[in-house]
Each structure stands twice: as structure tokens, then as C-alpha cells.
Amino acid sequence: LTVNMVMDVIAKMGFKNLTLASSSLSDCHAPLVEHIRQGVVTRIYTSGLRGPLAEEISRGLLAEPVQIHSHGGRVHLVQSGELNIDVAFLGVPSCDEFGNANGYTGKACCGSLGYAMVDADNAKQVVMLTEELLPYPHNPASIEQDQVDLIVKVDRVGDAAKIGAGATRMTTNPRELLIARSAADVIVNSGYFKEGFS
């Protein structure tokens, strides 16, 4: 919801020739097709594409190839300066009036704000979109107030029930659950797992 909402406003404001660097793009991002046709978006960096947007891009909708990267690869692109973020629009379930935010309080809980934290650290401007303003200080904060330039209250940032759509999903498969448990055990026992870990 956040990407579509932001891009609709940006298009109405007349911006063109933008690079979109969204973590992943799925069925719900079909409205981006029209923004690409209108020249609002001309380049895309993402970890995955699905649905009508992917179909149209596969047919040559974009003049430039989409830059597909891993999750860790995106962090490297941003931190190395290869991918410069002029404005990061970060959808969070809740924050306080100064922008202190995490991903696990509020109605639209989304989990870790790992990508958003990297964007907040490296973007020239950070716009926080939230559906719930909580009392100051909202903590623990994954993104802190000194990283946020503007806060916009919106009706809805996303649908927590659909956070597992696309490539991410819940499983009941015993083998997959064993792999997940083993991975969690490695993280917990790595020596890096502590309060505030993301």
C-alpha cells in the first residue's frame, strides 16, 4: 500500500525519471505499470518482481534492465553509494511525533525494519509514513528521531495479514520448520544476538 500511495502522489506532483528502490514488488504493485508508462519511474532496483508488473517489464516496459539483488546485496549497494537514496519513504506501523519507530507495535506490525534502518541511515531525506502516532518516547526504536525529517500520518501503511505473500510464507512442513529452528539457534548462539538485534 505504501509504495502505491507514495508513487500516486509523486506522479500527481509531476516528478519524472525516478529510480524506484523497493525491497520487493508483487501483485499489489500493479499500479506501478502506469507510472512507468508515464515516465515517472524509469529505473528499478529490487529483490524480486511478481504479478502484472513483472509481466509487463518482461515484455519490455522499462528501457533499462531491472537491477535484481539479494537482500544483503541491497544493503551493500546503499552503503557503498552505488545506489543513492534522495528520499526514503518508510512505512511503519507506529511512531511517536518525532519519528522514533519500530516494526512490532501498532496494527500493521511488519517485523524487523532492517531495510528501513539502512535507508534511514543513508538517505538524504527520510519521510516516515505511519498509521498510528504513539506517546513520546516510543521505544525501543529501530529508527530514531534524529534520522527522520518528516512524519506523515496515513490511514493505512499495509496489511499485516499479507506480509507473507509472494516469496515469503508461513510453513507447516516439518523439514522447513527444522531448517528454520536450526537457523534461529545459530543466530541466538552467534554472540551477536542481543537486545536491539535486527
Predicted regions and their residues:
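Conserved alpha/beta enzyme-core scaffold
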Residues: 1-198
